[in-house]
A protein has these predicted regions:
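Signature of N-terminal electron-transfer/Fe-S-associated modules in redox systems
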Residues: 1-114
Length: 114
C-alpha cells in the first residue's frame, strides 16, 4: 500500500497508545482514509496484518461505520438527512433534485468528478 511516510509514522505511533493492538483499528482506518481518500480492499488487508487480526474483523468495522468510504468519492460530498422528520419535510425530493441536477445517483460520483 502506498501511504505517505508521515501517515506510516502516525500509524506506528498510534498503535503504541493502546494496550491491545486491535483497539487501534478505528484510528488506523481514519488515518488511511485521510491519506488516500477511501478504504480499498488492500487497506483492510494491510490493517489486519498490521494489527494481527483477521481481515473480516477489519471489514466489519469498515462496513459498520458510515463515515468510512470503500470507494473514491468526488471532490464535493453532499449529504441529505433522510430521518423520518426530514423525510416528511421533503428530503427524498431534495435527493431527487440533486440526482437530476448533477446527473448521478445517490452514492455515485458525478461525471465531472466533482
Amino acid at each position: 500500500m502506498n501511504l505517505k511516510p508521515e501517515t506510516l509514522r502516525r500509524i506506528d505511533e498510534v498503535i503504541t497508545h493502546y494496550p491491545v493492538k486491535r483497539s487501534a483499528v478505528l484510528m488506523l482506518l481514519h488515518a488511511i482514509q485521510e491519506d488516500i481518500g477511501h478504504l480499498p480492499p488492500e487497506a483492510v488487508q494491510w490493517v489486519a496484518a498490521k494489527l494481527e487480526l483477521q481481515p473480516i474483523n477489519v471489514q466489519e468495522v469498515v462496513t459498520f461505520y458510515p463515515m468510512f468510504r470503500q470507494h473514491p468519492i468526488g471532490r464535493r460530498h453532499i449529504k441529505v438527512c433522510r430521518t423520518l422528520s426530514c423525510a416528511l419535510r421533503g428530503a427524498y425530493g431534495t435527493c431527487a433534485t440533486f440526482e437530476k441536477e448533477f446527473s448521478t445517483k445517490r452514492g455515485e460520483v458525478s461525471p465531472d468528478g466533482e
